[in-house]
């Protein structure tokens, strides 16, 4: 046994000395497999031309909803530029599988295929099943459930040919006005974000799907969407180390395969004015690679985003990102020009030849670990839509929403609901609500209030369930409650026993005085599964154990919540 461990260490050290030690290693990998990986990487690298080596650094986007002209353009880039991978965007699963079968069968080195699937493949494939957002997961106390969810995402990813889920988000969301992170963050507490992300990442990687923690060095306290322009993170180095960088530092030695670098301007880390983190040598190489010691794949955020695309030319941007220390340029808009400029910089001695070898061998090693060294077996698209949206997905989603449900107040002990009592139900705000009413009505007498006249007819001191149903059709919809709904809620609280359900972000309560409200629940999202899970928990069929994952205001703080069995 001792000799076997010693031999394995020798191989690992050999990989490190060759500059190809990625952070991700499949579970229970043997000495023999590690040695085979090194041999394959060396052999493959040596058989690639300079142009093919450069191609491995690039991932471009594939949309199946943009028509054949776009697909033909992707086909040309894949064939002519010998790129390293694809990111799947808004996709039809069947067409996407057909195209991957074509591209993978023809590739000299198989493509590394990624996707943003933070809440499952639904994020890109609308026939897939929607699983909860990170803010919902952050409320769950049993983090093993997050592993269960990401393991399901991994199983789904394999069915459509995806090897890399660009998730989880480890940004600490300390800014309620953040327009792009918000629901995508596990919350405002460093420890909770780190633990949630670790379980999520393990669920992916233990099924051999790569994870990527993002958005380094921390996108949580911004009020600009980097898809549109360059956000500023103006905190001191001390604050950055304590908050923004803390989850990355906690996770960097946990074997996570990728780190995605954001398009952010962080003056405390980059002294040159207006330079995004993604093209900053100080941030990518000096901080992430050298100071923090990260050895896995480093990938840029999408290079078509306004934060960088408005500032730099396509191709030039790719070369800058590579010089900064990134291994992979994601969503490249100028592969041929990027390759030309990187090659020119290598020939001029601006970038060491060894640097290219390091990145390409890291990419190849990851491909080997993910099984991309093997001959491609075409995927089947038959029944794919049904497989991505099954009864098992529904059961998992409802279990997760039930575990996240958070009871902030229950002053009059109105929960659980009593079967022999009548409850009035008033839906407020813009989103659907009927599923919630229908589920409640299975066990209770529910009178749905539909207009002003019916509100006036509610007997005084009635038990009134008020649902704040926010539009959750995307993760980026506003969470704020209208002044009209807030005024109506507080007026009703003067005359009735209120059970308030927030089917949306807990930040919706930021400007609401909950003092006169008897009972307050947060369900985090407004969809059929969250409504069913909430109704069943209110009826006592499931326990309530969630905790608020963000600091909302002085009254509603991180970790707030009570259990109800």
Predicted regions and their residues:
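Short glycine-enriched loops at secondary-structure junctions
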Residues: 63-66, 115-123, 163-173, 213-219, ...
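Short acidic, glycine-rich surface-loop motifs adjacent to enzyme active sites
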Residues: 75-91, 176-177, 252-275, 463-475
């Amino acid at each position: 046994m001792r000799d076997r461990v010693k031999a394995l260490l020798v191989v690992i050290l050999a990989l490190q000395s060759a500059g190809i030690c990625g952070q991700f290693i499949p579970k229970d990998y043997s000495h023999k497999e590690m040695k085979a990986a090194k041999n394959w990487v060396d052999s493959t690298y040596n058989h690639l031309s300079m142009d093919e080596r450069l191609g491995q650094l690039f991932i471009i986007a594939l949309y199946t909803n943009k028509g054949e002209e776009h697909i033909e353009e992707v086909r040309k880039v894949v064939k002519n530029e010998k790129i390293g991978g694809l990111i799947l965007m808004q996709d039809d699963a069947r067409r996407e599988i057909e195209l991957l079968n074509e591209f993978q069968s023809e590739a000299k080195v198989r493509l590394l295929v990624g996707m943003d699937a933070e809440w499952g493949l639904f994020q890109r494939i609308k026939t897939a099943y929607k699983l909860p957002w990170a803010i919902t997961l952050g409320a769950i106390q049993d983090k093993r459930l997050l592993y269960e969810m990401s393991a399901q995402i991994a199983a789904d990813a394999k069915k459509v040919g995806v090897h890399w889920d660009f998730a989880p988000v480890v940004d600490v969301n300390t800014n309620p006005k953040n327009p792009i992170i918000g629901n995508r963050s596990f919350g405002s507490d460093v420890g909770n974000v780190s633990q949630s992300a670790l379980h999520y990442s393990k669920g992916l990687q233990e099924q051999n799907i790569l994870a990527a923690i993002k958005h380094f060095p921390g996108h949580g306290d911004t009020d600009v969407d980097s898809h549109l322009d360059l956000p500023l993170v103006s905190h001191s180095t001390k604050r950055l180390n304590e908050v923004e960088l803390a989850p990355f530092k906690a996770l960097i030695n946990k074997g996570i395969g990728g780190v995605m670098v954001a398009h952010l301007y962080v003056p405390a880390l980059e002294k040159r004015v207006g330079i995004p983190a993604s093209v900053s040598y100080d941030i990518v190489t000096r901080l992430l690679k050298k100071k923090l010691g990260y050895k896995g794949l480093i990938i840029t955020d999408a290079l078509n985003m306004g934060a960088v695309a408005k500032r730099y030319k396509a191709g030039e941007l790719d070369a800058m990102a590579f010089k900064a220390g990134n291994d992979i340029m994601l969503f490249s808009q100028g592969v041929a020009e990027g390759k030309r400029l990187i090659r020119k910089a290598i020939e001029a001695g601006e970038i060491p030849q060894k640097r290219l070898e390091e990145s390409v061998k890291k990419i190849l090693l990851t491909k080997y670990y993910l099984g991309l060294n093997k001959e491609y077996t075409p995927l089947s698209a038959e029944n794919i839509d049904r497989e991505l949206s099954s009864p098992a997905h529904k059961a998992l989603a409802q279990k997760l929403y039930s575990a996240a449900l958070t009871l902030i107040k229950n002053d009059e002990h109105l929960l659980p609901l009593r079967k022999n009592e009548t409850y009035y139900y008033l839906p407020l705000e813009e989103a659907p609500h009927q599923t919630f009413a229908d589920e409640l009505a299975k066990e209770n007498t529910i009178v749905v209030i539909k207009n002003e006249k019916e509100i006036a007819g509610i007997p005084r001191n009635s038990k009134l369930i008020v649902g704040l149903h926010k539009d959750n059709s995307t993760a980026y919809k506003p969470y704020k409650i209208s002044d009209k709904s807030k005024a109506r809620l507080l007026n009703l609280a003067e005359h009735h026993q209120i059970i308030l359900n927030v089917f949306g972000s807990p930040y919706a309560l930021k400007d609401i005085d909950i003092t006169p409200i008897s009972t307050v629940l947060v369900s985090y999202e407004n969809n059929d599964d969250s409504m069913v899970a909430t109704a069943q928990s209110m009826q006592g069929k499931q326990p309530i154990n969630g905790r608020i994952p963000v600091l909302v205001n002085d009254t509603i703080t991180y970790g707030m919540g009570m259990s109800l069995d």
